[in-house]
Amino acid sequence: MRLVILIASLLVLTEPSNSSALDQPGSSCDDLGALAADPLRQSEPVRFEDIQAKRLISACRTDIESATKAQDQARYYLQLGRGQLRDDDTGGAMASFNKSASFAYPAGYFAFGVAYLLGDDVGKDDTKAKVYLLLALKGNVVWAAKALSALHQNRASEFYDAKLAQNYLTLFQDSQF
């Protein structure tokens, strides 16, 4: 459950959005589930609480099957994972986030890195979390800096470093890459 809450907070509270899935005119995976933290998103972001899980899951599965570009498939898998998470299918969400990350998709790395950071539905692994979050940050996923700050703030982590935690937090707050 902690995984759902933190992933939801990191995948939801990214930036304010005036859009909601109910306002979206389209029925595509992008229109129904775009993540604000995704620098490669193709539509206005949809807040997590506004996701219509069943519609999003169906649209993403359809779009995955018809996608011809790997980047599009990766984005659709990320958004499919959001729908599955909204539908309380954490196992399905993890598989979708993993698939997105397997395409080297920056926001997919972010989602998977957060999962390893928390360690609820996958074994907690700070090393893997750091690797995935750094890959996400390299791909300009601003929210990865905040997750890295949390990792380095944790006194129980082998990566505890208060100064580095503050640097990542400042990077996140400044949103300068």
Where are these regions (language model features)?
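N-terminal leader/linker segments that initiate helical-solenoid repeat arrays
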Residues: 17-64
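Terminal, low-structured helical/coil segments at or just beyond the last alpha-helical repeat
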Residues: 25, 149-177
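TPR/TPR-like alpha-solenoid signature
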Residues: 26, 30-33, 78, 110, ...
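Short coil/turn and helix-start
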Residues: 50-54, 68-70, 86-91, 102, ...
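Hydrophobic face of amphipathic alpha-helices that form TPR/SEL1-like repeat modules
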Residues: 78-84, 111-118, 147-155
